Amino acid sequence: MSKTERPSRRAALLGDRPGSYAIARHVRMSASKCRRVINLVRGMDAVDAVTMLKFQPQAAAEPIRKVIASAMANAEQTEGLRADDLYISQAFVDEGITMRRIRPRAKGSASRILKRSAHITVVVEPKEARQARKKAKSGRPAAAAKSETEKGA
C-alpha cells in the first residue's frame, strides 16, 4: 500500500489481496456513456484492455484507458507486480456532480441544461488471484450444492 492510499478504500476494494486501483473523479461525461465502455473491458487482461480502448470510437474510451494505465502503474510501483500479469477484476462508474445551467427559451421561459460528470474506478489484480477465486467458487461441497437443487425442485 502506498502512503497516499486511504486504508479504508483499499480494504473495501481489495481486502488483503495483492493488486491496486485507480480512480478518476469528476470526469466530464455522463456515467451511462462511460458504463457502455467499461462493460467492454471488465474481466479482461489489463494490457489487452488498454490496446483495445485505443481503437474504440466512443469518447469515454480515452479517460477509461488512462485510469487503467494508472492502476497498472500503481500496481507496478507499490506492489511490485508486472503489468503483463494483471487483469481488471473490478471496474465501475458512479455518478458525479451535475452542474445545472440555464438556456433561455421563448416567451421569457427557460430550460435546464444538465452537465453530468462521473467517477471511474478500476481495480487490477494478478491473474493468479482470478484462478484462486474460481477454484474457491467451484470448490463448494457437493452435498450442499445437491441439497440446494432439491429445495428448488
From Swiss-Prot:
One of its GO terms (biological process) is translation. Gene3D superfamilies: Ribosomal protein L22/L17 (3.90.470.10). InterPro entries: Ribosomal_uL22, Ribosomal_uL22_bac/chlpt-type, Ribosomal_uL22_bac/org-type, Ribosomal_uL22_CS, Ribosomal_uL22_sf. Transmembrane segments: none annotated. Residues 125-153 are annotated as: Disordered. One of its GO terms (molecular function) is structural constituent of ribosome. Keywords: Ribonucleoprotein, Ribosomal protein, RNA-binding, rRNA-binding. The keyword RNA-binding applies. It comes from the Bacteria. One of its GO terms (cellular component) is cytosolic large ribosomal subunit. Part of the 50S ribosomal subunit. This protein binds specifically to 23S rRNA; its binding is stimulated by other ribosomal proteins, e.g. L4, L17, and L20. It is important during the early stages of 50S assembly. It makes multiple contacts with different domains of the 23S rRNA in the assembled 50S subunit and ribosome. The globular domain of the protein is located near the polypeptide exit tunnel on the outside of the subunit, while an extended beta-hairpin is found that lines the wall of the exit tunnel in the center of the 70S ribosome. HAMAP family: Ribosomal_uL22_B (MF_01331_B). Belongs to the universal ribosomal protein uL22 family. This is Large ribosomal subunit protein uL22. The lineage of its organism: Bacteria, Bacillati, Actinomycetota, Actinomycetes, Propionibacteriales. The gene is rplV.
